[in-house]
């Protein structure tokens, strides 16, 4: 089995390493601009599938594509990119429930069989002061993360509760769903753990 993660994200790579199965990483190409009136669910499913397909053009094997966005009050939040936007995002999220949509796609590039699913995960934020938000951003600099936080780091202090079936989903790669998808492709991860 040749498993390829269609991602340059160090977070997704770290998550997949938890399974102790061999894999490589490849840089995908996909236009991440949402289409007109595209829902968060549809957007992440489309992008996860496109990322896997883009890598499948040049590489053979089972290719994992993934994409994630956060949604609050019906608005899709992407990666902030800088401190000012991150501050604005966290101010907007303060005291609210945020739903994270994570698209996961598995492509067999030899047969072109592809399955795509979307996992959701809810995060309930504490009411945060401007001082708390500024201090958090000073310490963690989560500018490359949807929602402007790292739940696997200091970001956990921003939340009052979490609700979802797999905490890895929140970081960007739903492992429980991935193991089930691999099984559908007749891959038992236990046989490949090293």
From Swiss-Prot:
Domain of life, source organism: Bacteria
Annotated site, Important for substrate specificity, chain positions: 11, 68, 152
Enzyme class of the recorded protein, top EC level: hydrolase
GO molecular function: nucleoside triphosphate diphosphatase activity
EC number: 3.6.1.-
Described function: Nucleoside triphosphate pyrophosphatase that hydrolyzes 7-methyl-GTP (m(7)GTP). May have a dual role in cell division arrest and in preventing the incorporation of modified nucleotides into cellular nucleic acids.
Protein name (record): 7-methyl-GTP pyrophosphatase
Organism: Pseudoalteromonas atlantica (strain T6c / ATCC BAA-1087)
